């Protein structure tokens, strides 16, 4: 699950692994409200404005890796823990989260092998549709929305997302799967996304809200991400983000995962 929406690859999968460990509790969510119809800007124009607002295409393409450090909390359960994420081009990532009562959860993709390890499940080798989704989500330059990765990208409507005017965009991937993204009308920045990702429990629909954009180096990134799924909420906050400092060895597949590869 990554929500695939930021360069440090904090996705739905990591949140799902933690949230499924707790009993569900109601989380109020603010559903998008449809506004009156009007002439809509092309989706490509909306996406390109976001790219410009966070630093520009050239600045994004100049990066080779990111290392993010932050905190993660689950308000309904009263839990707060640590978060760390590594991401490198073209499509490698490692995410690590530690929470009281749940322990450490790791997810990774080395460009070929997808895996997860937690104290709850032990080592798991990701395959099938989950692996396909992880490969897609791991794209280091996902923010650019390269046309060749999609069947179509279109503006659906102007609506309200988290209390603010937003453009709703539908992204249809090769193969037919769809993601929805929301872009703030006033700031041009990506405000959130709605996506479905496969899990051991089946397909899970999740909503991610991006906020508190801050500049790290030459690029702006959202420092707060609220993930809502399965009637639970997880809040991830980034306090430090570095570019170009990741050792490639960090993406090495762990021994306990290698033991599962046939």
Where are the regions a protein language model picked out?
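N-terminal low-complexity, Pro/Thr/Ser-rich intrinsically disordered segments
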Residues: 32-49
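Acidic/charged, solvent-exposed loop-and-adjacent secondary-structure segments enriched in E/D, K/R, S/T
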Residues: 115-142
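Short, conserved active-site entrance elements at the starts or edges of catalytic domains
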Residues: 133-168, 189-192
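Gly/Pro-enriched, hydrophobic low-complexity segments
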Residues: 29, 98-100, 162-257
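N-terminal mature ectodomain segment of secretory-pathway/periplasmic proteins
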Residues: 44-122, 148-160, 173
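Bacterial N-terminal signal peptides
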Residues: 9-21
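N-terminal secretory signal peptides that target proteins for export/translocation
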Residues: 1-6
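Signal peptide processing junction and immediate N-terminal pro/mature segment
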Residues: 21-32
């Amino acid at each position: 699950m990554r929500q695939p929406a930021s360069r440090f690859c904090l996705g739905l999968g990591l949140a799902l692994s933690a949230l499924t460990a707790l009993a569900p509790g109601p989380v109020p969510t603010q559903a998008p409200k449809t506004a009156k119809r009007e002439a809509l800007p092309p989706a490509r124009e909306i996406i390109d404005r976001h790219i410009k607002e966070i630093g520009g295409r050239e600045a994004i393409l100049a990066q080779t890796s990111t290392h993010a450090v932050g905190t993660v909390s689950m308000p309904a359960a009263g839990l707060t823990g640590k978060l760390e994420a590594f991401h490198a081009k073209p499509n490698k990532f490692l995410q690590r989260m530690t929470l009281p009562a749940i322990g450490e959860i790791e997810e990774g993709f080395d460009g070929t092998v997808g895996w997860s390890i937690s104290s709850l499940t032990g080592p798991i080798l990701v395959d099938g549709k989950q692996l396909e989704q992880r490969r897609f989500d791991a794209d280091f330059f996902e923010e650019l929305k390269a046309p060749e990765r999609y069947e179509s990208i279109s503006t659906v409507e102007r609506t309200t997302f988290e209390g603010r005017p937003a453009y709703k965009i539908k992204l249809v991937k090769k193969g037919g799967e769809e993601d929805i993204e929301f872009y703030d009308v006033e700031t041009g920045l990506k405000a959130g996304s709605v996506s479905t990702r496969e899990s051991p429990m089946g397909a899970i629909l999740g909503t991610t809200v991006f906020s508190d954009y801050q500049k790290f180096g030459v690029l702006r990134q959202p420092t707060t991400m609220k993930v809502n799924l399965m009637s639970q909420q997880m809040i991830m906050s980034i306090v430090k983000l570095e570019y170009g400092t990741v050792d490639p060895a960090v993406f090495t597949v762990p021994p306990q995962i290698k033991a599962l590869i046939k």
